[in-house]
């Protein structure tokens, strides 16, 4: 199991293929020489559910046998890790927002995940953008005063919100920096500024409504609803999480949990299933222990 940053559509194809090749070579060096690869599972953002044969060949061709490769969106592997492949729903809300639900017939429904330019509702990017717009509204006297404005002015050393425009339009001010800005605002204003708190409540409600739509569309009728959540907004933004949970609980009895396993182990589970390996509780514990030990070795 190995992970690295990959976006199938948001990065140059040559760069993504280079990363895939590096991951495979790194794995080969870590494993005993006699080991033979039989099944490959690769997850990448920018892919919805299962990749097409054309996508697999473009990404994996001449690196490893793409016909024996399972290439899926990162939401699919996140879901596998979260639920261990069982029926349920996973709400991912970090830099972006993606909801994935699976019913008893193992049919997947995915909503969101379109990226910031197409409005990932409730995401950290979305929150940061709404905060900047709230500061602009205050400046233009079309909205209430907010502590967001002095916070932005102090951090970016500007006199007013007009000075922020060259900053956010700079090519290096990526969507990840919007997400970092959202986290910084939450740390500074999380329980004090009413404008900021309302933005966070709106974010949680938007993600909750998207989750309800995914559940309804999937036909998932399990009660209580197995609902898993991940991503910085739902894990650390208290106002957003409270609003998200209240929105879901207004319609369903819920069993709310964090993912059982990390996304990278979801990819491992897909490969094991394709190799007809049964996913038992003991195997899950082994995966968890191995992952923990590897992380400890790397940190030391």
Task: Describe the residue ranges of each PLM region.
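ATP-binding/phosphotransfer module of carbohydrate and carboxylate kinases, centering on a glycine-rich
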Residues: 1-37, 82-87, 133-300
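Hydrophobic residues at beta-strand termini and immediately following loops
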Residues: 3, 72, 111
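Short beta-strand-loop/turn "lid" adjacent to the catalytic site in phosphate-handling enzymes
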Residues: 8-9, 25-70, 82-83
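Gly/Ser/Thr-rich loops at beta-strand to alpha-helix junctions
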Residues: 46-50, 95-97, 234-235
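Glycine/charged-rich beta-loop-alpha catalytic/anionic-binding loops adjacent to active sites
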Residues: 60-64, 68, 107-115, 246-255
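Conserved phosphate-binding catalytic cores of ATP/NTP-utilizing and phosphoryl-transfer enzymes
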Residues: 67-91, 107
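Short gly/pro/ser/thr-enriched loop/turn and capping motifs at secondary-structure boundaries
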Residues: 77-78, 98-100, 264
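Glycine-rich phosphate-binding loop of actin/hexokinase-like ATP-binding domains
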Residues: 86-143, 300
């Amino acid at each position: 199991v190995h992970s690295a940053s990959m976006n199938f559509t948001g990065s140059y194809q040559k760069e993504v293929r280079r990363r895939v090749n590096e991951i495979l070579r790194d794995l080969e060096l870590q494993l005993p020489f006699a080991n033979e690869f039989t099944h490959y599972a690769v997850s990448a953002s920018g892919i919805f559910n299962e990749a097409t044969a054309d996508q697999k060949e473009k990404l994996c061709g001449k690196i490893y046998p793409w016909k024996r490769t399972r290439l899926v969106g990162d939401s699919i592997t996140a879901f596998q890790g979260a639920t261990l492949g069982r029926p349920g729903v996973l709400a991912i809300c970090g830099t972006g927002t993606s909801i994935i639900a699976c019913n008893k017939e193992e049919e997947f429904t995915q909503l969101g995940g379109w990226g910031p330019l197409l409005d990932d509702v409730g995401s950290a990017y979305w929150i940061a953008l709404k905060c900047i717009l709230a500061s602009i509204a205050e400046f233009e006297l079309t909205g209430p005063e907010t502590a967001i404005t002095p916070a932005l002015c102090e951090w970016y050393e500007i006199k007013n919100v007009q000075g922020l425009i060259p900053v956010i339009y700079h090519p290096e001010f990526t969507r990840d920096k919007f997400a970092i800005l959202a986290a910084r605002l939450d740390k500074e204003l999380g329980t004090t500024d009413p404008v900021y708190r309302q933005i966070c409540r709106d974010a949680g409600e938007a993600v909750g409504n998207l989750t309800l739509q995914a559940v309804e569309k999937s036909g998932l009728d399990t009660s209580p609803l197995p609902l898993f959540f991940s991503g910085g907004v739902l894990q650390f933004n208290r106002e957003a999480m409270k609003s998200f949970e209240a929105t879901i609980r207004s319609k369903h009895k819920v069993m709310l949990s964090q993912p059982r396993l990390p996304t990278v182990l979801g990819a491992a589970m897909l490969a094991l299933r394709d190799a007809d390996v049964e996913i038992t509780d003991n195997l899950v514990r082994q995966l968890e222990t191995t992952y923990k030990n590897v992380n400890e070795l790397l940190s030391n």
